[in-house]
């Protein structure tokens, strides 16, 4: 605790005029236990900052900034045709916008008609269009009309659903639009980035994405700008007055004013055509999956047709009959509704996520989020509240806590716009240090250098009321200690006590801030440590437990010290295997073999004292081990990791750079929002997966049955009934996008070998059931079989096929037995209506002009339910079968040693490369 002995560093001036200060009251207030500051307590911080600004000249400086950028940092007249005292006027802005247009890349407006026509393009659609041509050639205008209607129905439904869902997402995306702060009409204004025009004076600071090309005009400017998206440079580039900055680059450090020299297509990015729209609705891997499925089904159709043609030519069937057989196989062989249903499911899911404050930047992000196995999460704001509160300080012998607090507050921002959470916490706690609070405004800030992520310090140069020049430092304790040690030796007992206190605070979960000062040209003085805590969010522990049940591993990556990270991780139930990121040894040192580095990262619960490169390395290593990785971030430095991750997640309050790099942007705080979105994405993926299995099984079912029936018995279903089977299969399941699908308790991804294996098995079971139905109608018993006594063979088969196929979706949509999950009313209602319609077809003999007895209909319903139960049993047994999965994949344990050797080589190469870069 604080040592109040008289010896030690002389205190700063905290003198107050006689009679103006109640010392007893102050002592009672100063040394009573400091309670944590409540989350919603903002007390008179803004008023206090305004008071500080007015005393040290910052207020005047900001007013001057509104007139002349940077308080005297005037833009040269020969560089700009802009009034340097007021920026552009409203009239000039209008004129320049009329001349140069909006600051955005010219994009061809999406032609809705062409987009609609796109729903008629693809392997599956081409087959159906070929079937329509074939029907027209046979002059079967009924089938021609029905096939065209089916194609049109799928296109209309897909287009309308995607358009409506896209509109919802676009509306919310508007809240993510990049902003720009410009000087106009004498004031600094925040505007939308597209509204920037040439000649605008733009204010940029850490975290800003520069919206247009420009030239720095601030006299003493020092910016570090990330241009990696343009030039591939991995390190930030230093920029000074007169240097050019480019659109889409991100400011990593510093602040300055920039005059805009080019906008829109005239920027470097525009000319190079290198800007990729991160918010495109790319469909990603699932489009490749669908095209692959369509191609394979097309091959199966061709194979089945070869069998049909050979058998037909062998029997010398008429060409018209052969064409009718061809038309039937073509219609049932490819699921025309597959692309529309899957795209609709994704679009509706994106709209649903948007309503839950998760903005999907591209549809493929839903698919990748559903498969995420490891979440690399930052600590502050995601796992914790990002609301710091101070606790009792540790002071070096002879240092007054009031003096420590005053020095720490002097090394704090005095601008409302630039104040960070740490500075805000210090100013809030000033009420417990009345003497420091009363004199703080008497000190004038001459220079202020915000937190530097490399030196891990904040530095301020101030002038005391007596005119003394004082340098105040606040930052990471060991870095502050190093600053003092570089100036002069520190007594061993002071040094050891200081380090012990840092370790003690860390084990208790506190984040420590060291405080030091230098008077004039004197020596540096170490004052002490101020502990603060960013407590875990109230829901984080529960959410972490839920994440574990969902098969999601969370690794915490934080810049805090190991002790703090380990204690926070313990409180949250994440585990205590937290290590210093330097142990990875990827910065040029380290002797751990590459494969052991990979094992180390895989086994760790998180890493502390991380830099941006460490985050990138961790994500890359986990990906190379075969994991799908999500990464959360909010700052400029997180952008490379967000891009590298399979799913980049920008958390609430993220910088423009992080939002641009992310796949999903969250507008709600905390880990709970991410886990909620993950569950929703798994539901969406499950709907797609269930429908794909269902639809492939249906195609295989009828290809097997009709192919064999034609080849063996030279018979086929009435072509009109075949068309309606295809219609019913698609119409009944269009509502799958709105189903109450269960979400998997484990990460999900496209398991194509297993998907095909399961679909083929279900298709075979369906085909066997239909074949049994046919054989009973050929039976020669006492009653002569169903067909002679009860109705028409084609109508009975039509009903049996329709019922068993429609009910299959109830099996594939469930994770367990089909009764374990209740389907939505939309899906149940659609299937029920189709079943009733199919029954009416059969009873009244539509297209066959032959009635079917109600007895036969009841028998078919009962028989179909039996087939449904068998399919349900097969699916339930095999869906979680490791043996079946391995059989489909042909997995082998060989090759692991080869992988580890490759990992050793990659890490060795990376270390050599890093050492070479450092030696340059």
UniProtKB/Swiss-Prot annotation:
Signal peptide: none annotated. Its EC number is 7.1.2.1. SMART domains: Cation_ATPase_N. Keywords: ATP-binding, Cell membrane, Hydrogen ion transport, Ion transport, Magnesium, Membrane, Metal-binding, Nucleotide-binding, Phosphoprotein, Translocase, Transmembrane, Transmembrane helix, Transport. The active site is at 378 (4-aspartylphosphate intermediate). The keyword Transcription regulation does not apply. The plasma membrane ATPase of plants and fungi is a hydrogen ion pump. The proton gradient it generates drives the active transport of nutrients by H(+)-symport. The resulting external acidification and/or internal alkinization may mediate growth responses. This is Plasma membrane ATPase. GO terms for biological process: proton export across plasma membrane; proton transmembrane transport; regulation of intracellular pH. GO terms for molecular function: ATP binding; ATP hydrolysis activity; metal ion binding; P-type proton-exporting transporter activity. It comes from Neurospora crassa (strain ATCC 24698 / 74-OR23-1A / CBS 708.71 / DSM 1257 / FGSC 987). The keyword Phosphoprotein applies. It comes from the Eukaryota. One of its GO terms (cellular component) is plasma membrane. Residues 1-77 are annotated as: Disordered. Belongs to the cation transport ATPase (P-type) (TC 3.A.3) family. Type IIIA subfamily. Residues 139-140, 315-321, 714-720, 780-806, 848-853 are extracellular. It is a multi-pass membrane protein.
